[in-house]
Amino acid sequence: MEVFILELVLGSKNITLEDLINVTRKGYKVSISEEAYEKIDKARALVDKYVEEGKVSYGITTGFGKFAEVSISKEQTGQLQKNIVMSHSCNVGNPLPIDIAKGIVLLRAVNLAKGYSGARRIVIEKLVELLNKDVTPWIPEKGSVGSSGDLSPLAHMSLVLIGLGKAYYKGELLEAKDALAKADIEPIPALSSKEGLALTNGTQALTSTGAHVLYDAINLSKHLDIAASLTMEGLHGIIDAYDPRIGEVRGHLGQINTAKNMRNILAGSKNVTKQGVERVQDSYVLRCIPQIHGASKDTLEYVKQKVELELNAVTDNPIIFVDTDEVISGGNFHGQPMALPFDFLGIALSEMANVSERRIEKMVNPAINNGLPAFLVEKGGLNSGFMIVQYSAASLVSENKVLAHPASVDSIPTSANQEDHVSMGSVAAKKSKDIFENVRKVIGMELITACQAIDLKEAKDKLSPATKVAYDEVRKIISYVSEDRPMYIDIHAAEDLIKTNKIVENVEKAIGKLEF
């Protein structure tokens, strides 16, 4: 039987968001093209030439940051590169998830494969070997200001290459030297000129973090449309608001796609209604689903464009231009081009939870829930039902509003004011991750609340084919709430169900791909 090895070849073409996820979550192998090797060798030769001739070049024959004016001798260049890795590894807090840490390794390898950094072959080969043998650097999540790039988290990554720090081997946390030994990887004996800087100067930590959030947010936006459709079923929502002509006269693609999703998901439902039958129009959280969800989708699409640029960007400093024999100091390490999009990502995610929570409130509030019992429970008063589910959702939405404050508008100068404007892009990326995790919980709450409303309406036999699929997936693991029970169990189960992506996968099997 022929075995096909799924592989990403660096240097042959630009990588995509999907490529990143294939390596970090699906175990795709990585290799280096001959074209990339040629570029790497040429850039390295120019670095060696600068060192031999004693030319002044930042980070090659000088110190770093405020020490840029301090000359470093040829004999000290290797120690200089080891020192930057050791002294800059200052991150704190919980470790980054393994997939995000793998992404950092991959993106640094992509960067070096461009041939503008001047590191030797062995450096990029060791990064690739880490990926292919499932050794992942242990990197605490806090400590980067996003300029000069992600110095501290990338230093933690780089420690592993020289046998220092900590690393995971097949998920087990070990001292780096032990993880390397188990994987049969030899550490780099010594870093050479420019290599410590080439490893640590860039935006790969913030980019990997934000890229993984973005990938999951795209799938979550589909869950949001499905949850909203279940709510429409439970509240007998008016379908007219999703008429394609409404989107066409405004023109926003996210709105158009969301309306299409809603029409397709609800096609065949005998619960939804038409305007003027039960009431003239719905409140905004139902009627404006295409406009609200769609605006977040448009934002995700914008962020995706920026992310896929940055996945392939040269973010080193200085940059080696072999065609003109120049080593030029610039600012490609500055995280501002990604800090702003990741702040925008957090805002878009926050709004997804905002509207979802309002639909939960609409279902549990007897004044506005179209005839459902208060808090969706029989024997109300004795039972509180879904009352506190809405409290929990409100708490998470409120937290998101705080987290949605942009990090990129802040700057605290570093390195004795040599680095006098920083991006805080790593903070923006981390915030988007924290917001995402809250949003996923809130959408899980809407799923279980909507299924409860459907049961109370005795409407499950009138569901559309697609909403019936989603309803059944929920009911496989979360039963109808006939009397009070610990609701956190159901909430966590709903979140875990979203993590599996089974609802989206099975709905798409039933009706075709949902639009993003």
Curated annotation (Swiss-Prot):
GO terms for cellular component: cytoplasm. It holds the Pfam family Lyase_aromatic. Belongs to the PAL/histidase family. There is a cross-link at residues 147-149 (5-imidazolinone (Ser-Gly)). InterPro entries: Aromatic_Lyase, Fumarase/histidase_N, HutH, L-Aspartase-like, Phe/His_NH3-lyase_AS. Pathway: Amino-acid degradation; L-histidine degradation into L-glutamate; N-formimidoyl-L-glutamate from L-histidine: step 1/3. It is found in: Cytoplasm. Keywords: Cytoplasm, Histidine metabolism, Lyase. GO terms for molecular function: histidine ammonia-lyase activity. Its EC number is 4.3.1.3. The modification 2,3-didehydroalanine (Ser) is found at residue 148. This is Histidine ammonia-lyase 1. GO terms for biological process: L-histidine catabolic process; L-histidine catabolic process to glutamate and formamide; L-histidine catabolic process to glutamate and formate. Contains an active site 4-methylidene-imidazol-5-one (MIO), which is formed autocatalytically by cyclization and dehydration of residues Ser-Ser-Gly.
